[in-house]
């Protein structure tokens, strides 16, 4: 790779993004691809501290705009401190959530102004967008059932939200898919993990121009 390649993983709660990424890493390493994996919110010390504030289950009174601005602040710090240097070094950067999460969660989910969110994303990222976004789609009820069945997963504030919010979030992602289908690829996350990994691998390799 002569320059970096930015991939974002998106999807509703319980879509299994993390499991897919864990399965993909050894495959990419075998190909000799230098990979940086990271997440939002978080990824760097300041971002992880912001993550704690956002996801703390006791912070039930958090205002929607406060929530959005915290995500944006984490995004900026994460980008400057970790993501941009890796891209400049020619690495493949895979981010667990990025700009589309703000549109889906705070825009469609919380009902905040989409244009304002787009402006804040533009401001925080200086216009950077992923080269490829993998959207892992799953019915809301199935995703939440997966979370409930996973005893190892720590419950966060978003897990405590009602079904209505999560349905709006999924609708937001589907709207983004319609709008930016050249960048966003939908992957059926309800299938067995092995199939999801194979599909994801094929889409990623194709996007990066790697031999399968």
Curated annotation (Swiss-Prot):
Membrane keyword on record: no
Gene3D superfamilies xrefs: P-loop containing nucleotide triphosphate hydrolases (3.40.50.300)
TM annotation in the entry: none
Physiological role: Phosphorylation of dTMP to form dTDP in both de novo and salvage pathways of dTTP synthesis.
Gene: tmk
PROSITE patterns: THYMIDYLATE_KINASE
Pfam families found in the cross-reference section: Thymidylate_kin
Enzyme class: transferase
Species for this entry: Streptococcus pneumoniae serotype 4 (strain ATCC BAA-334 / TIGR4)
Family designation: Belongs to the thymidylate kinase family.
Top-level taxonomy: Bacteria, Bacillati, Bacillota, Bacilli, Lactobacillales
Listed EC numbers: 2.7.4.9
UniProt name for this protein: Thymidylate kinase
GO process terms (BP): dTDP biosynthetic process; dTTP biosynthetic process; dUDP biosynthetic process
GO CC list: cytosol
Catalysed reaction equations from the record: dTMP + ATP = dTDP + ADP
């Amino acid at each position: 790779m002569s320059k970096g390649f930015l991939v974002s993983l998106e999807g509703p709660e319980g879509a299994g993004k993390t499991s897919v990424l864990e399965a993909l890493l050894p495959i990419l390493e075998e190909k000799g691809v230098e990979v940086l994996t990271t997440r939002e919110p978080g990824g760097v010390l300041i971002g992880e501290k912001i993550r704690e504030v956002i996801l703390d289950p006791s912070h039930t009174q958090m205002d929607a705009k406060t929530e959005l601005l915290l995500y944006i602040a984490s995004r900026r710090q994460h980008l400057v401190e970790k993501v941009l240097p890796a891209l400049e070094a020619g690495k493949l950067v895979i981010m667990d959530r990025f700009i589309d999460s703000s549109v889906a969660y705070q825009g469609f989910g919380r009902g905040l102004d989409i244009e304002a969110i787009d402006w804040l994303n533009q401001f925080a990222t200086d216009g950077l967008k992923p080269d490829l976004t993998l959207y892992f789609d799953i019915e809301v009820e199935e995703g939440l059932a997966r979370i409930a069945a996973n005893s190892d997963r720590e419950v966060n504030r978003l897990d405590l939200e009602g079904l209505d919010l999560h349905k709006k979030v999924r609708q937001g992602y589907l709207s983004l898919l319609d709008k930016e289908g050249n960048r966003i690829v939908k992957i059926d996350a309800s299938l067995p993990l092995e199939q999801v990994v194979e599909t994801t691998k094929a889409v990623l390799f194709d996007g990066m121009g790697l031999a399968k």
